[in-house]
């Protein structure tokens, strides 16, 4: 988990400032990913909403407890969006930032998507209970957990985001 936290530190302290310098200081960023990348993308926007304002997460797992087995500490908690978002208070300063963000989640319901479907259902309930608006899109039973579908989803949602 320490290496994972160092990855966050690199993104926030080195990568974003370097790109901002070259791109005339754009303040907010979109984060996206598929499968484990969607998990990381969601974790980034919910942990650091001052830096990110748009999320496109395709086929992610948002309750990461299954990755840790019996091991739990502060880092596993802060890398489990279902855990910390369920417990965030409604008056937390981040709540307003979440409400101003575009949050898009998509999952197919075909082969290899069942855990992702269950995870998104669980997470969408948490977001609803926290009064955070998110577009949670469940695609058909022919839509499986793989790159050909993520390419289709990415093209579709990018058009929606940049309308």
Show where each model-derived region lies.
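Non-catalytic cap/lid and distal C-terminal segments of serine-dependent acyl enzymes
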Residues: 1-163
């Amino acid at each position: 988990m320490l290496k994972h936290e160092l990855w966050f530190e690199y993104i926030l302290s080195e990568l974003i400032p370097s790109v901002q310098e070259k791109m005339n200081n754009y303040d907010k960023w979109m984060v996206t990913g598929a499968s484990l990348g969607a998990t990381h993308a969601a974790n980034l926007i919910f942990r650091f909403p001052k830096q990110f304002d748009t999320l496109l997460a395709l086929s992610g797992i948002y309750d990461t407890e299954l990755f840790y087995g019996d091991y739990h500490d502060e880092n596993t908690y802060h890398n489990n969006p279902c855990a910390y978002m369920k417990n965030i208070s409604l008056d937390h300063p981040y709540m307003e930032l979440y409400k101003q963000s575009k949050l898009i989640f998509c999952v197919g319901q075909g082969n290899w998507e069942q855990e992702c479907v269950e995870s998104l259902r669980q997470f969408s309930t948490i977001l609803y209970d926290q009064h955070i608006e998110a577009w949670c899109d469940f695609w058909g039973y022919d839509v499986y957990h793989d790159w050909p579908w993520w390419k289709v989803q990415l093209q579709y949602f990018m058009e929606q985001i940049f309308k």
